[in-house]
């Protein structure tokens, strides 16, 4: 129910940000995520995705009542209800209305108000065919789990970078600890036409070789 209502909010937000040409081209409502396919010719920029996500979360924060009603198809269309392109409807249809924000023909189950969705996060979008893009999103506690996972990954990355920097600094200290004056050069020696130069480097401690 949560992800179904979130899909309606996403649909209208996509139209608001990308344009009225956006239409649903497919969807999947799963308990842990939602997937929404739309008609759109271009890649959706990160700024546009942020704007879309912001609108959805604003509507969630407004805790708008989700109303369902049965109306004639003609009446629903006059009220501006969004219908799926190519879908066949009977004389009477079920209309899901989310305040003044969204009105769609839909037979699915929904939450009673948008606040029950709690949170909304777009994970990514991609092109699945010419002119069709697919958006993956999550809601509620799945957003918290996703953000924690990303935070943990970032922490591991920072730790790895920190380790690299420490190793780099250690190597620099080791090189700087070698006294140039302590390098004793030996004469160049010839081995079967190959000239080799030997030298001896004196280090302060055996641990410097580790």
Model-predicted segments: where are they?
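Non-catalytic interaction/regulatory segments
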Residues: 38-128, 137
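Generic, well-ordered alpha-helical scaffold segments in large soluble proteins
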Residues: 9-17, 51-62, 138, 142, ...
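Active/ligand-binding-proximal structured segments within catalytic/core domains
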Residues: 1-38
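Gly/Ser/Thr-rich helix-start
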Residues: 27, 108-109, 132
């Amino acid at each position: 129910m949560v992800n179904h209502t979130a899909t309606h909010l996403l649909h209208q937000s996509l139209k608001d940000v990308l344009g009225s040409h956006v239409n649903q081209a497919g969807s999947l409502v799963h308990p842990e995520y939602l997937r929404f396919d739309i008609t759109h010719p271009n890649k959706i920029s990160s700024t546009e995705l942020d704007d879309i996500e912001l609108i959805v979360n604003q509507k969630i924060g407004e805790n708008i009542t989700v109303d369902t009603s049965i109306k004639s198809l003609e009446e629903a269309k006059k009220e501006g209800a969004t219908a799926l392109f190519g879908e066949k409807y009977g004389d009477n249809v079920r209309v899901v209305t989310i305040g003044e924000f969204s009105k769609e023909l839909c037979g699915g189950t929904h939450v009673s108000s948008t606040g029950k969705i709690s949170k909304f996060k777009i994970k990514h979008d991609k092109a699945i065919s010419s002119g069709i893009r697919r958006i993956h999103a999550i809601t509620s506690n799945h957003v918290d789990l996703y953000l924690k996972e990303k935070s943990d990954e970032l922490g591991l990355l920072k730790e790895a970078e920190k380790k690299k920097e420490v190793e780099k600094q250690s190597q620099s200290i080791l090189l700087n600890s070698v006294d140039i004056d302590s390098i004793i050069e030996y004469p160049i020696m010839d081995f079967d036409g190959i000239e080799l130069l030997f030298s001896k480097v004196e280090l302060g401690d055996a641990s410097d070789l580790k």
